[in-house]
A protein has these predicted regions:
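General marker for long, soluble alpha-helical cores
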Residues: 1-114
Length: 114
């Protein structure tokens, strides 16, 4: 049986989160978004925010769901997703931020040319 928000918030897992992160998870729940994506305690606040924003705009946040990504990598991936690109192949934390930005820039350049 899937866990409800009410049972999760009372669980030991929820106790791992500070108030700011709990509020973000609650906002996702209140917006009928998949709040369970945000319950990975390895995400920092900025990473959670990038995932939450992606979900808020009805985009698939799965390419961002790697806690080893930096905040900046997540932000670039989110921008790519918002532009309609499949960013799944680029969610490798070993891709440097500058290289990831170059990939995003090239995708945007190709989009404008077509």
């Amino acid at each position: 049986m899937p866990q409800t928000f009410d049972t999760w918030i009372k669980s030991d897992r929820a106790q791992q989160f500070d108030l700011i992160r709990l509020k973000m998870i609650k906002k996702a729940y209140d917006a009928n978004l998949d709040w369970t994506i945000l319950t990975n305690p390895k995400y920092n606040i900025k990473q959670m925010h990038e995932i939450w924003i992606t979900m808020l705009y009805n985009n698939n946040p799965r390419p961002l769901c790697n806690p080893k990504l930096t905040d900046q990598q997540m932000r670039i991936l989110r921008k790519g997703i918002e532009e309609g690109f499949d960013m799944s192949p680029y969610n490798d934390p070993n891709i440097e931020q500058t290289q990831l930005f170059e990939i995003f820039s090239n995708l945007m350049k190709n989009k404008k040319e077509n």
